[in-house]
Amino acid sequence: MVANAKKDELSLTPMLNAYPDSLGGTLSDIADLLESSCKDAFGAFYILPSVFNTDLDRGFSVVDYSLNELLATPQDLERIRALGIRLKLDFILNHASVLSPQFQDLLKNGEMSKYKDFFIDWNAFWAGCGEMMPGGYIQPTPEYLHKMFFRKPGLPILRVRMPDGTEKPYWNTFCLLYTSPSPRDPKTS
């Protein structure tokens, strides 16, 4: 019985890896499956990050770490745990959404944000390793870029308008669309 494996034997048991909505629609549906046709088949369940409140990329752009109530409830997690299945949750701390409270604080407070170091300043990261372009970002030299994998075409830069009106490039692998706040149009104020 996999679910009754000793703690030191757990690494030898099968682990289910799934998005909470990938097997039926919700984590509750997965719990139903684990209680019935897959009973005792898994010793652990690695739940991919769309279990949290996210806005892009199947959960890899976290707004906050509350459970996404459309997909999961604390009761769903408890049902799975009660089966003797260890839960592994992917917190992906390095994938904050532009809607996250931390990024919103950066937009509001700029360099004074207590979260400014949560985000990678593109130019600070590449300082001394490329050329400043007219667009205000450093273009890394080919010797660095050819060793890297980028998920999407182009450089993963998000230009962010700071409170003082300047724009700053940040490294952003997932969201390439962001609308900087702009001054109110006098016609709509």
Language-model regions, residue ranges each:
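Acidic/aromatic-lined carbohydrate-recognition and catalytic surfaces
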Residues: 2-180, 184
